[in-house]
Amino acid sequence: AEMEKEIIKEQKHNNIDAFIICPAPGSDTKDMLKKQCAKTPYTLIMEDVYSKEGGNSGNPVIGPDYYKIGSELGKELGKKRQKIGVVANWKESKSDQDAIRGLKDSLKDTKSEIDWYCYRKKDQNIYEKVSKKDKVDAIVVLDPHALEELGEQSDEDSYQGADIYGIGSSVKAVVLLD
């Protein structure tokens, strides 16, 4: 939130009309936005700010329907019996929670099941963490950065034959998933 705060202060001096902000994870972002943008309208992109109380912050948010994304992944994975591992960015992220809820809901009436979850911590090598997990048939990666990291390593068959499914928007992620 500290970097966002500096950018917001800098842009206020440029007489901007409004902000479009991709919020940093953490509970301090909500308070920072209230203070820094009290007189300037803003819209959040990708996801709402985190609140320890949970729920919606009341801020306008534009972003993908993560529940539907998770649900669609679940429909695909539920077509055959599979043990699934899930890699996500941050346990408290609403987007990750929604995607996991959609995935679980779609898998309810199938023979597929989620065997483990792996959440990234700051500056953590996600490849090392995932490679220590139990063998699964498929790995669902909800963190675009982790998807790129894991995709780069998949050429070496480092996931014991597991197929990788994921959410990503970069050309690199698309190529690695192909």
Language-model segment annotations:
Residues 38-39, 105-113, 154-160:
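Short helix-capping segments at alpha-helix termini
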Residues 15-24, 42-45, 85-88, 114-115, ...:
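Periplasmic-binding protein-like
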Residues 1, 23, 60, 83-92:
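Short beta-strand segments enriched in small/hydrophobic residues
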Residues 29-68, 168-178:
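Flexible loop/hinge segments that line or gate small-molecule binding clefts
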Residues 68-116:
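An alpha-beta-alpha
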Residues 25-28, 48-52, 90-94, 120-123, ...:
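Solvent-exposed loop/turn segments at secondary-structure junctions
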Residues 138, 145-147, 152-178:
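Exported/periplasmic ABC-transporter solute-binding proteins
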